[in-house]
A protein has these predicted regions:
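Compact, glycine-rich, soluble single-domain proteins
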Residues: 42-56
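Short beta-strand-to-turn element immediately C-terminal to the catalytic PLP-Schiff-base lysine
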Residues: 31-32, 112
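Alpha-helix C-terminal capping segments
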Residues: 31, 61-67
């Protein structure tokens, strides 16, 4: 799947985010090496500690379905009502989850960088 198409999937996932506290909605689309795409959105909680990021939601869905090999992830984020066209990098906890399951030299992270453009980097480069 091409990077811009994967970003479009992440934008769809972002629409399902539950963010009553920050109003910052994030979507992620995780492509497995088997070709399946798993979507995730951020899900907030009033105490913040149990809040789950979009990236981890996508990974946990995939792992719970038996996936263990991943190719790349597209991530988008913005305030509710805004276009998700600016870079939104994964937090440290999400990076650690990626390190657990992915080769940092190969796993690609795709971030929106404009309406129809993106930046691509490996987990190691991030």
């Amino acid at each position: 799947m091409d990077n811009l198409k994967l970003l479009e999937e992440a934008k769809k996932a972002r629409l399902k985010a539950y963010t009553p506290y920050s109003n910052f909605k994030v979507g992620a689309a995780l492509l497995t090496k088997s070709g399946k795409v798993y979507l995730g959105c951020n899900i907030e909680n009033a105490t913040y500690t149990p809040t789950n990021c979009a990236e981890r939601t996508a990974f946990f869905k995939a792992v719970s379905e038996g996936e263990r090999e991943f190719e790349k992830i597209a991530i988008v984020g913005a305030k509710d009502g805004e276009d998700a066209n600016e870079m939104c990098a994964p937090c440290g906890v999400c990076r650690q989850v990626m390190m657990e399951f992915c080769n940092p030299k190969e796993f690609q992270i795709i971030l929106a960088d404009g309406e129809n453009t993106c930046r691509v980097m490996t987990l190691e480069e991030l």
